[in-house]
Every structure is written in C-alpha cells, then in structure tokens.
From Swiss-Prot:
It catalyses: 1-(5-phospho-beta-D-ribosyl)-ATP + diphosphate = 5-phospho-alpha-D-ribose 1-diphosphate + ATP. Pfam families: HisG. CDD domains: PBP2_HisGs. This is ATP phosphoribosyltransferase. Lacks the C-terminal regulatory region which is replaced by HisZ. It comes from Bacillus cereus (strain ATCC 14579 / DSM 31 / CCUG 7414 / JCM 2152 / NBRC 15305 / NCIMB 9373 / NCTC 2599 / NRRL B-3711). Belongs to the ATP phosphoribosyltransferase family. Short subfamily.
Length: 211
C-alpha cells in the first residue's frame, strides 16, 4: 500500500475531522498529542498527516506535496486551485454574511464600501447582484470597520454570531453556507487511485451513517 499524505489545518476544523478519520480506522493519536510537531504518521495505516495554515492546504495539494487535503469551502471559493473537490464532509458548517451596524441600509443606491478578508467572494457576490461596491481588504478583525467608518458593511464568516453581537453588528444578508471539503491532487488520483478512493468511500459511508 502506497503512503497517503493528508494536509490538515490546525484549530477548529482539525477538531471536527479527527473523529471522522478515527471512525474509519485511521489512528490519530500522534495528531491529538502533537506538541509542536507538524508531520505525523498514523500507527496502524499507510496514512501520514501534515499540519499547515488553512490558506496553504490547497496549495500543498495542488503541488502534490499532499495527496489529500481537508479545507473549508471558503478557501476554495476565494482561491482558485487546480485540484479535485471530492467530498463535502458536513462538518465545520458556517455561513458567509453581510453584516453592519443597525443603521446600515442595504437598499441604498449609494456605492457601498465593503470590508472583508475575502475580496474575490465578495466582489463576485455583489457583481452577481448587479451592485457596484468598493472592496476594502482587511486581514484582521473586520468587525471594527463599520464602527470606525472605514466601511459601510462587512462580509465575513459567521458561525454563532456572538462576535458580531458583541460588537453591535447584525446580519443583513446570508450569502453562502460553507463546510469542510476533501480535496485531492489530480496526479495522485491516478497513481494512488485505490488508496485514495478507499479513504473517500469509507468517509462517505461514515458521513451518511451519521445523518
């Protein structure tokens, strides 16, 4: 059996997907007790894991460093990569929203300024609506932008809405629902077809049985 390398991202998504891998028989004990390590070998299978930043998962898969990647749909929507999107894992579910202070008027004809970490997704959404907006890209916390007058509204990922509420913002539009996806390197799907599809099929069955 050829080794399969899987790229994961640290944090919330990692905690969601580790149980899925364990349920299909892939040992994740090293991954759960990782310390500062970034590369891990499953003890009972031909699978190894690498931990990288969320925005880099698809890059590692695209360039063949990883055969499989687990990444949020938001990353795939914002950054076009030459990979196969194989499976919706049904975890890490949240949504893209337009949010602002309560006095914001989404129906105003004035050109709006929208602050976001996701300029491509945001521009596409408003273009499809026929609205001309100015996109202001922000890397940090976007919630502050409407409060300080930098932007009329923000586009961001919302899970519980608690952060918005704490900053006095409300949701005006729900744009897209997103979740964790399994992606695969195109060349690896040919050279390691049996190994990759074995993981995909077991994962799919586990997801369906859990619904």
């Amino acid at each position: 059996m050829r080794n399969i390398q899987i790229a994961l991202t640290k944090g919330r998504l990692e905690k969601h997907v580790i149980p899925l891998f364990e349920q299909i028989g892939i040992d994740c004990s090293e991954l759960k007790n990782k310390g500062r390590k970034l590369v891990f070998q499953s003890k009972n299978t031909n699978v190894s894991f690498i931990l990288v930043k969320a925005v880099d998962v698809a890059t590692y898969v695209e360039h063949g460093v990883a055969d499989i990647g687990i990444v949020g749909k938001d990353i795939l929507m914002e950054n076009e990569k030459d990979i196969y999107e194989m499976l919706d894992l049904g975890v890490g579910i949240c949504k893209f929203c337009v949010a602002s202070i309560p006095t914001y008027n989404p129906k105003s004809y004035r050109k709006k300024r929208i602050a976001t970490k996701y300029p491509h997704i945001t521009s596409t959404y408003f273009h499809d609506k026929g609205e001309d907006v100015e996109i202001i890209k922000i890397e940090g916390s976007v919630e502050i932008a409407p409060l300080l007058g930098l932007a009329d509204a923000i586009v961001d990922i919302v899970e519980t809405g608690k952060t918005l509420q704490e900053n006095g913002l409300i949701v005006f539009e729900e744009m897209y629902f997103i979740s964790a996806r399994m992606i695969v390197n195109k060349a690896a799907l040919k050279t390691k077809k049996d190994e990759i599809f074995s993981i995909i099929n077991m994962m799919e069955q586990e997801i369906l049985s859990g619904k």
